[in-house]
Amino acid sequence: MKPLVIKLGGVLLDTPAAMENLFTALANYQQNFDRPLVIVHGGGCIVDELMQRLHLPVQKKNGLRVTPSDHIEIITGALAGIANKTLVAQAAKFHLNPVGLCLADGNLTYATQLDPELGHVATVVPKNPALLNNLLGEAFLPIISSIAVDKQGLLMNVNADQAATAIAALIQADLVMLSDVDGVLDANKQRLPELNGAQIEQLIKDNVITDGMVVKVNAALDAAKMLNQGVDIANWKYPEKLTALFAGEIIGTRIKP
């Protein structure tokens, strides 16, 4: 089976019961299926909490966190440290053989600064799959934070959706984006199992897809186009459905290129 990349949204990291449910589902899945799994995560809520504790301002531009050079060490500590090791600890509890990584380890990706006004924020492209392939071949569970390093050796913060897309492209994997939404809903609040780019454009125009959902759907559409395959948006709140999702069933909305 193709590997599966699971992108985890930040709110999950703030919800211990949800994390427990997720890793229970992953453990059940791995007992019954022989499919390599990779987790890619952000952790915006953990970054925000840490910044608040340190009385540092949180500034965003077009939905992306502005990361000046005096903040990148704190953000790296939050994402590659607290968030990553929290997930590794949960996975270890369920005997899932986790290995905590960032996007720079083993030259997995190549990072380029996105916009000088955003500071230490980058986009990444796939580079070298050897480390991941070796880990997956030995039945490890890689858990990858969205911290990268550019060619100058500078730490960079990467949007977790974009990071997950690059990792999925790197190892030719399927991609599932887990967050706190059931998928895309129509005007009658009914879940839409599948959508393509033209349908998404129309739903945004009709104000059916609004606010934060626009960002989620566009990220999934970008990923679907780059990977040339469907990308699922699904909710982590239903542990009983997650095993089916990991096996390829649609429980949320599949965004098609």
UniProtKB/Swiss-Prot annotation:
Protein's cellular compartments: Cytoplasm
Q: What class of enzyme is it?
A: transferase
**A GO BP annotation:** arginine biosynthetic process via ornithine
Q: Does the keyword Transferase apply?
A: yes
UniProt keyword terms in alphabetical order: Amino-acid biosynthesis, Arginine biosynthesis, ATP-binding, Cytoplasm, Kinase, Nucleotide-binding, Transferase
Q: Which GO terms describe its cellular component?
A: cytoplasm
According to its UniProt record, which reaction does this protein catalyse? N-acetyl-L-glutamate + ATP = N-acetyl-L-glutamyl 5-phosphate + ADP
Q: What is its EC number?
A: 2.7.2.8
Membrane-spanning segments: none
Instruction: Provide the site residues for: Transition state stabilizer.
Output: K7, K216
SUPFAM superfamilies recorded: Carbamate kinase-like
**NCBIfam families per the record?**
argB (TIGR00761)
Q: What is this protein called?
A: Acetylglutamate kinase
| Organism per entry | Pasteurella multocida (strain Pm70)
Q: Which gene encodes it?
A: argB
